[in-house]
């Protein structure tokens, strides 16, 4: 019994400390059904940064990305104008729940990519990576700039 309690204590302590380690300012973690993946992100949180996004970049490392954050939930529409690399765009709500994943957006396209409504942000990562890692709608993210009172995975 003591061994079991010790094991549970260690497991819970590890899980909590591991989750908190994902709350550093430049890290965003995606929790999927069977795994978690940490991305090192740039933050686009003002109109100029959001307008420029990842335009004119010639490459993007796996597990790097850019997170776009908005002040209040809204309808998000993206495009790939002047973006030279294929991207996946992962749209999420204010709780950090992934609502839509657009896989393999075409470079330089001016086609509108509709994320949906009531969204607080989007994460752009290397094209087709979300499929390779098994991400799906309903998965969740942890990020230090989400409202802790609403986030499924808060940062404290």
Language model features by range: what are they?
Residues 7-8, 18-20:
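Cleavable N-terminal signal peptides
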């Amino acid at each position: 019994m003591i061994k079991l309690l010790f094991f549970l204590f260690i497991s819970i302590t590890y899980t909590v400390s591991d989750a908190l380690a994902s709350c550093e300012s430049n890290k965003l973690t995606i929790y999927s059904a069977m795994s978690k993946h940490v991305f090192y992100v740039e933050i686009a949180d003002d109109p100029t940064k959001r307008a420029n996004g990842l335009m004119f970049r010639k490459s993007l490392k796996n597990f790097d990305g850019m997170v776009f954050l908005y002040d209040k939930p809204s309808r998000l529409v993206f495009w790939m104008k002047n973006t030279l690399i294929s991207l996946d765009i992962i749209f999420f709500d204010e709780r950090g729940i992934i609502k839509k994943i657009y896989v393999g957006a075409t470079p330089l396209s001016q086609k509108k990519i509709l994320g949906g409504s009531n969204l607080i942000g989007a994460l752009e990562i290397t094209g087709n990576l979300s499929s390779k890692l098994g991400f799906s709608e309903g998965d969740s993210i942890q990020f230090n700039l989400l409202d802790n009172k609403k986030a499924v995975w808060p940062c404290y």
